[in-house]
């Protein structure tokens, strides 16, 4: 990393503020940082960098993450030492883990992905077949945290000498060992302060149940090593990495259970992980709502046996638990979904409708439209006006969009967009017809714009390619229909309308003439509308 007296490298700034290189480039683009060229390379003027730290950090949403990291001076080592001392005198060992977790700074939790598992979840997730013999079986928790999975394994009858646990946190290891000693009066030598992803050998276990780190941050070179080690192409999130490492450490026909973020079930980046899981016998998929106080993310459970799922039409059903409902779903019903989505909120009957629809020839928006993001100003307070002034034009946000109209404009922007952080090709904004839609929404809301309006990044848009078989307005009507909302909800159930999800939706344009008629469309598809939210296959 280079730093001259008058210039600082982009790498140094990114490292010191704990942000990506692209964030620094965005600050340069929006003139928050001034550059200088040295040795045929671009640097940031040190005076400009110091001025940026003094005048902008903490005052701008653009660098909120960097500011948070910079201001968070919490010393994790000091906290560990503090709790190791408490461990010597505390009698409430189980509670000590909760107190420790609460005192961890949000930055440390987010960087390391540390969220300890409540006992109620451990007991529901960690179940074994009635004929499973624990007397000689080995158990491992690769990220043992406060030891809840290990304590449950002992409760189920696993022997202490057959229990293994790993964690990189010294306090987690000490607490788990102490809990075992307090409860059973025995030292457990196999609880080790090691990184499970970097073990020198590959031990083989009969049973692994764990809550791996969620969204732990890894350096680029670490990701490259993991990509080669686990033979992954895209799923390089910590949850995927621990999934692969756990599979590698399981004997044939052994049992695996993971507590995961809900995104593992439906987001594109985890499709590789889902595809691998489907090659084995998945036993349970479980929804645990939002069990962690500081996280808005839902938690889900995945339980499988490392037994090859030899045929895609395997009749052995997967038990899906969602809220108060239990469904039985075939592995095929998931492998048949776009991106192998595990839509466990979708009942067997509802999924039959999806399977029926996807079996009918259809087209999608993939490769049939030019997509564009709304404009990212970089600083809305500075670049947006509440009333129209000279050389400004209206700009709309996602909240202004409804299915048939736009609200009266309440924001205006300079006609010169060169100072904005991100602008798509103007030809897309200025297209004769474009379809715009709310980005942050669980409901599909599309509007056909024929007046070349501008939109902020809370709205996205696309322009149909020339040979698309129906008109933009007609497609807008189809996308706003109850059937499309049903398909979207039963597949994705997200609060963001993502391009890759839209590109999966089936479009049966062969059943549409000049106008979209829902009744005719459903008849052609052999689908009956029970009400606005429920559909069934016609008998």
Residue ranges and their predicted role:
Residues 18-42:
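Major-groove DNA-recognition helix of helix-turn-helix-type DNA-binding domains
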Residues 120-121, 144, 148-150, 160, ...:
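Signature of N6-adenine DNA methyltransferases within the class I
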Residues 21, 26, 353-539:
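Polybasic, glycine- and aromatic-enriched phosphate-binding surface used to engage nucleic acids
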């Amino acid at each position: 990393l280079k730093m001259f007296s008058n210039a600082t490298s982009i790498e140094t700034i990114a490292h010191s503020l704990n942000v990506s290189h692209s964030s620094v480039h965005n600050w340069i683009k929006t003139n928050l940082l001034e550059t200088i060229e040295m040795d045929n390379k671009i640097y940031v003027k040190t005076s400009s960098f110091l001025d940026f730290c003094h005048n902008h950090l903490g005052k701008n949403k653009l660098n909120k993450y960097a500011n948070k990291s910079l201001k968070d001076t919490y010393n994790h080592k000091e906290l560990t030492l503090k709790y190791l001392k408490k461990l010597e005198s505390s009698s409430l060992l189980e509670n000590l883990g909760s107190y420790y977790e609460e005192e961890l700074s949000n930055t440390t939790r987010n960087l390391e992905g540390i969220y300890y598992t409540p006992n109620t979840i451990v007991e529901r997730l960690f179940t074994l077949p009635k004929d499973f013999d624990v007397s000689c079986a080995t158990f491992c928790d690769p990220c043992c945290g406060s030891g809840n999975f290990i304590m449950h394994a002992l409760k189920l009858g696993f022997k202490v000498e057959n229990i293994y646990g790993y964690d990189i946190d010294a306090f987690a290891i000490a607490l788990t060992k102490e809990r075992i000693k307090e409860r059973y009066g025995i030292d457990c030598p196999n609880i080790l302060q090691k990184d499970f992803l970097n073990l020198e050998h590959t031990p083989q276990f009969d049973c692994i149940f764990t809550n791996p780190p969620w969204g732990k941050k890894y350096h680029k070179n670490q990701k490259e090593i993991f990509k080669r080690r686990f033979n992954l192409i895209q799923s390089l999130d910590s949850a995927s990495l621990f999934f692969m490492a756990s599979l590698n450490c399981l004997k044939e026909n052994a049992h695996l259970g993971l507590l995961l973020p809900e995104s593992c079930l439906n987001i594109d980046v985890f499709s590789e992980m889902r595809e691998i899981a489907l090659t084995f016998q998945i036993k349970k998929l479980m929804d645990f709502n939002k069990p962690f106080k500081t996280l808005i993310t839902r938690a889900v459970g995945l339980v499988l046996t490392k037994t090859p799922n030899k045929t895609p039409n395997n009749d052995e059903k997967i038990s899906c638990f969602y809220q108060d409902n239990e469904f039985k779903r075939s592995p095929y019903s998931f492998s048949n979904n776009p991106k192998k989505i595990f839509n466990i909120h979708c009942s067997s009957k509802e999924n039959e409708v999806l399977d029926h629809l996807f079996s009918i020839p259809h087209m999608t928006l993939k490769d049939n439209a030019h997509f564009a993001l709304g404009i990212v100003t970089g600083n809305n307070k500075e670049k947006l006006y509440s009333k129209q002034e000279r050389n400004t034009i209206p700009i709309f946000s996602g909240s202004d969009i409804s299915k048939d109209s736009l609200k009266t404009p309440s924001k205006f922007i300079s006609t010169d967009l060169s100072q904005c952080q991100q602008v798509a090709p103007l030809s897309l904004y200025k297209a004769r017809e474009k379809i715009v839609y709310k980005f942050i929404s669980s409901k599909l809301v599309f509007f056909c714009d024929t007046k070349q309006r501008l939109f902020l990044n809370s709205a996205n848009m696309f322009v149909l390619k020339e040979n698309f078989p129906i008109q933009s307005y007609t497609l807008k009507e189809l996308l706003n229909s109850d059937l499309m909302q049903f398909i979207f909800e039963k597949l994705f159930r997200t609060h963001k309308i993502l391009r890759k999800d839209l590109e999966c939706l089936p479009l049966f344009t062969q059943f549409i003439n000049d106008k979209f008629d829902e009744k005719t469309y459903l008849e052609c598809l052999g689908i009956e509308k029970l009400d606005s939210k429920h559909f069934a296959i016609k008998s």
